[in-house]
């Protein structure tokens, strides 16, 4: 055994050993499935990856040592726009670019010592994977959950192509051509996630081991609203204008209606003299993003259509407007304007001089007209015809009941959640396995013809239709149903489809006959521990839950939720240098520090140094492999686990990285001194042995408990404390010391696997430390013979003394009164009461 810790000698040797050893299943043991959200193969790991993957690696190694049959797989979320952009910019095929990146990142993961079941590795861009993605899509089709309808896309009028949202800048221009982007309708594919809205909402209550924050975010995204759908008649439109409202008790206060600019009624009902203004406004709104339109920080804009509808409750005419803040995809695409009792409506009505009516009086009767602000609370109905005097909740019920009787509306539950648009006008994605036949209509590709493979000979220009839409030879096929000439679907699927079921494929990754066997998923699923960023709290996690429920209903799964426990790790931050005036960021090598202030070189521009999320654009990223090359993989892993609790932000610190490297060196020294006999074997007493053994078993108790509770930082702190206790211990060969050496190596192994394996071998042990048993806790070793007792007199601390741990209350009182510091406050006074907090303090109440 070398005298000094040298990770550069240890780590390659251990990694080679692990790579050559088969990944053995441990049948007959309870299962544990640990999973980190699989990465997009960008080609380079960042510290956020290292933090995420270190967490599940610790958990999986720990669980294996605790006797579990562990599944800890990895794969690649490999479809997506960056590969297609690389094809355009660099002339390299997306498949080649992706494969190169996967190979590079696979090597990086191995160099960091992560214990993955590499034999289960998947890549979503592989036909062997997306064959089954297509098969599952067809399950949705058979269930009536996949359909086509017109949807709005971003259209680049110069390049004549559809753009993803991320390809449109803040000014609404194309990232490539610079043209102002237009909104255009296009037939696209959707999945009916709204059919599962209520179950997705209610089942959040069963996810007790998910962060509350994530559950609330999903609840808000689903956005359940209970209210009514009411119909306002309008000439020439048999169905009238349908609106949804959560406040039917305010219907007598409606002074206008607002349609979304995209609403199909707009063109039909607009008065001739208003058409030019309305069309101009619609065109203007189409260039705005949804986020801009609903932003609370910008003024609401609208224009009158010149049309008039009828409020059936009052018999009064109400003008019909269109406004940017109403979205066609939400509700009915129309809202009723009640400015007296809605803040947004109040602002809009004030801006356009529309009437404002009071129809809900405050309980104290304090409101008078004209209203100076919207009253949005519940109250008592006024100016509401036969419903006057009812409180708001009762008024809601009675008005909905009356509307149903009159045929003017009905009670309704609405969700903010919209059906999932999965069509992408892209090449590098999973082809949608559908064919369009002039005789049969939309026809699914039969199972035996799957996968519908992506053609390899494709031209990428970034202009015109999707590359697939240009390949007539690929598009033209025979109809699977009647044999007539037909055409393939040229859209590919949203990449969230791929990641909505990958955790199921890992259970049976080499199955060539089906996406997964029922036996495999029944054994491994649900995932016991899932780890990933909070940015996936809504879409990925919600879509995965949706997929699980649909596949359950199709008879493919037997469980309701995919992930039992969820941990969302915090971001990794590092110092970034920015010019506050221009918001320009500077690389560290262009920054100099003078007197605690920072300046740009060479012009001396004053800069601000702040901790920000690591990013290439901010020049503050830390390459994990740079840290590994200097300090080793174990140090990098230990740092990201120790620096902060996993759910909190982690601030990078070079000094703390060095601190973890030094700690590993000290543990190495502890084991070396034991193995070599360099530490003197001085005689020790039984009490000293008991004290050290207590420290050893405290560490066993704390490290195991802390891993279970994600407290990796305090677990590592407990290891540091134990190593310090052993370094200070006089005997280097006593039974307690020997036990401590073996224990600290085992406890360290899940966190720092390379040094753990090396030290295990140095101790003369055969086999892999990570398949050995976790140290057994001896509860009796934790019992203390003496404790430090705080003594209070009338609630104020007067002394602390060592007392036998098993002393009775009477004995504690005697010992307390024997203290000279205590007697100064009790002599000559009567003891009225004695309060004992076992193991902590005694309080003497005197008077």
UniProtKB/Swiss-Prot annotation:
Gene Ontology terms, MF aspect: aminoacyl-tRNA deacylase activity; ATP binding; leucine-tRNA ligase activity
Highest taxon of source: Bacteria
Protein's GO biological process: leucyl-tRNA aminoacylation
Motif ('HIGH' region): 39-49
Any Pfam family matching the protein: Anticodon_1
EC number(s) recorded for this UniProt protein: 6.1.1.4
Binding site for ATP: 616
Protein name, as recorded: Leucine--tRNA ligase
Originating species: Gloeobacter violaceus (strain ATCC 29082 / PCC 7421)
């Amino acid at each position: 055994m070398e005298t000094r810790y040298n990770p550069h000698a240890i780590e390659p040797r251990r990694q080679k050993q692990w790579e050559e050893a088969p990944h053995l299943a441990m049948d007959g043991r309870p299962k544990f499935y640990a999973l980190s959200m699989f990465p997009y193969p960008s080609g380079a790991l960042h510290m956020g990856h290292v933090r995420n993957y270190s967490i599940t690696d610790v958990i999986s190694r720990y669980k294996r040592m605790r006797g579990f049959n562990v599944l800890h797989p990895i794969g690649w979320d490999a479809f997506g726009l960056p590969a297609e952009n690389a094809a355009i910019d660099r002339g390299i095929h997306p498949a080649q670019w992706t494969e190169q990146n996967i190979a590079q990142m696979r090597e990086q993961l191995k160099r960091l010592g992560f214990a993955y079941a590499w034999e289960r590795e998947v890549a979503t861009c592989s036909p062997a994977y997306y064959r089954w993605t297509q098969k599952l899509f067809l399950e949705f089709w058979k269930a009536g959950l996949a359909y086509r309808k017109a949807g709005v896309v971003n259209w680049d009028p110069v390049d004549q192509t559809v753009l993803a949202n991320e390809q449109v800048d803040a000014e609404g221009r194309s990232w490539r051509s610079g043209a102002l982007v237009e909104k255009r309708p296009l037939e696209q594919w959707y999945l009916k996630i709204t059919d599962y809205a209520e179950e997705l909402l209610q089942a959040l209550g069963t996810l007790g081991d998910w962060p509350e924050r994530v559950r609330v975010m999903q609840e808000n995204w689903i956005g359940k609203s209970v209210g009514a759908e009411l119909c306002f008649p309008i000439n020439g439109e048999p169905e009238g204008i349908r609106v949804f409202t959560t406040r039917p008790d305010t219907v007598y206060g409606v002074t206008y209606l607002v349609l979304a600019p995209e609403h199909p009624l707009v063109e039909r009902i607009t008065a001739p003299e208003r058409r030019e203004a309305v069309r101009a406004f619609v065109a203007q709104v189409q260039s705005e993003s949804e986020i801009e339109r609903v932003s609370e920080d910008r003024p609401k804009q609208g224009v009158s259509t010149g049309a008039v509808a009828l409020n059936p409750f009052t018999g009064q005419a109400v003008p019909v407007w269109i406004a940017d803040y109403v979205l066609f995809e939400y509700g009915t695409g129309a809202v009723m304007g009640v400015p007296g009792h809605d803040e947004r409506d109040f602002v809009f009505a004030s801006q356009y001089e529309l009437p404002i009516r009071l129809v809900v009086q405050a309980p104290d009767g304090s409101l008078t007209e004209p209203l100076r602000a919207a009253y949005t609370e519940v109250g008592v109905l006024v100016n509401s015809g036969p419903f006057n005097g009812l409180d708001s909740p009762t008024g809601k019920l009675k008005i909905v009941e009356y509307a149903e009787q009159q045929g003017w509306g009905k009670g309704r539950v609405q969700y903010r959640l919209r059906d999932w648009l999965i069509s992408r006008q892209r090449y590098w994605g999973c082809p949608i396995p559908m064919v369009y036949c002039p005789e049969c209509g939309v026809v699914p590709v039969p199972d035996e013809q799957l996968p519908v493979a992506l053609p390899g000979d494709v031209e990428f220009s970034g202009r015109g239709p999707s590359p697939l839409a240009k390949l007539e030879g690929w598009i033209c096929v025979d109809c699977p149903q009647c044999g007539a000439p037909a055409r393939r679907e040229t859209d590919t699927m949203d990449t969230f489809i791929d990641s909505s079921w990958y955790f199921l494929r890992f259970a049976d990754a080499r199955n060539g006959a089906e996406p997964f066997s029922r036996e495999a998923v029944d054994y491994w699923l649900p995932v016991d521990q899932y780890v990933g960023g909070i940015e996936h709290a809504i879409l990925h996690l919600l879509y995965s839950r949706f997929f699980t429920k649909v596949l359950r209903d199709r008879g493919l799964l037997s469980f309701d939720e995919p992930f039992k426990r969820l941990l969302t790790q915090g971001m990794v931050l590092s110092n970034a240098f920015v010019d506050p005036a221009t918001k320009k960021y500077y690389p560290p090598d262009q920054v100099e520090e003078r007197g605690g202030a920072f300046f740009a070189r060479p012009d001396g521009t004053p800069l601000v140094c702040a901790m920000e999320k690591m990013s290439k654009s901010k020049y503050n990223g830390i390459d994990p492999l740079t840290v590994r090359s200097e300090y080793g993989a174990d140090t990098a892993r230990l740092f990201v686990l120790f620096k902060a609790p996993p759910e909190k932000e982690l601030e990078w610190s070079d000094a703390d990285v060095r601190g973890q490297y030094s700690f590993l060196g000290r543990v190495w020294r502890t084991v070396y001194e034991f193995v070599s006999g360099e530490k003197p074997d001085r005689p020790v007493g039984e009490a000293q042995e008991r004290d050290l053994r207590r420290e050893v078993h405290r560490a066993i108790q704390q490290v195991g408990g802390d891993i279970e509770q994600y407290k990796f930082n305090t677990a590592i702190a407990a290891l540091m404390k134990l190593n310090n206790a052993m370094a200070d211990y006089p005997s280097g060969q006593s039974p307690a010391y020997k036990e401590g050496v073996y224990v600290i190596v085992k406890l360290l192994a899940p966190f720092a696997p390379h040094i753990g394996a090396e030290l295990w071998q140095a101790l003369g042990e055969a086999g892999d430390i990570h398949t050995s048993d976790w140290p057994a806790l001896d509860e009796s070793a934790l019992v203390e013979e003496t404790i430090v007792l705080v003594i209070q007199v009338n609630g104020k601390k007067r002394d602390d003394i060592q007392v036998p741990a098993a002393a009775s209350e009477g004995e504690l009182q005697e010992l307390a009164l024997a203290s000279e510091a205590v007697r100064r406050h009790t002599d000559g006074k009567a003891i009225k009461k004695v309060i004992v907090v076992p193991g902590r303090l005694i309080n003497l109440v005197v008077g």
